[in-house]
Amino acid sequence: MRESLKKLLHIEDTPERTALAFSIGIFLGFSPFLGLHTLAGLAVAFLFKLNRVAILLGVWSNTPWWLVPFYTFATWLGMWVIRFRIDWATLERMFQLGKEKGFLTSEFWMQIASQWGLLASFLTGSLILALLLSLIAYPLSLN
């Protein structure tokens, strides 16, 4: 049983492969694809036969405490990169709609979707920061 578990989890990988799995997990955990991080991590781990524990530790390093500050900064970075501007009145209107109608309503998300630049900024900034964090994580986890 113990040997089967080791094979399933790929615990006995080389340090380089374990560090790679962790850094891929970091990338996926901080990617903009909210709600799919764990599934994506497991899919990548099984597809490339990587250390499942290391990849999940990387994915789960983006805790709820980090979500708002990270994605706020990522969106700001994306806005700077793609040169997108949005006025505060529009942001306030969207936030007010979310508070009144609910952040999970189709009306709120239709308003968000109408601001394509905001979504593009979110995606761009999140991918840049996720890549940067994963590149930092590899050498740190290797040592």
Language-model segments: residues:
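Transmembrane helix boundary and interhelical junction motifs in multipass membrane proteins
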Residues: 31-44, 48-74
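Hydrophobic residues within alpha-helical transmembrane segments
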Residues: 23-24, 57-61, 124, 128
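Small-residue-enriched transmembrane helix starts and helix-helix packing motifs
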Residues: 4-28
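Membrane-interfacial helix-loop-helix junctions in multi-pass membrane proteins
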Residues: 101-121
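Transmembrane alpha-helical segments in integral membrane proteins
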Residues: 120-143
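Hydrophobic alpha-helical transmembrane segments
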Residues: 3-11, 63-82
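Juxtamembrane non-transmembrane "cap" segments at the membrane-aqueous interface
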Residues: 75-105
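Hydrophobic alpha-helical transmembrane segments of integral membrane proteins
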Residues: 14-18, 22, 34, 38, ...
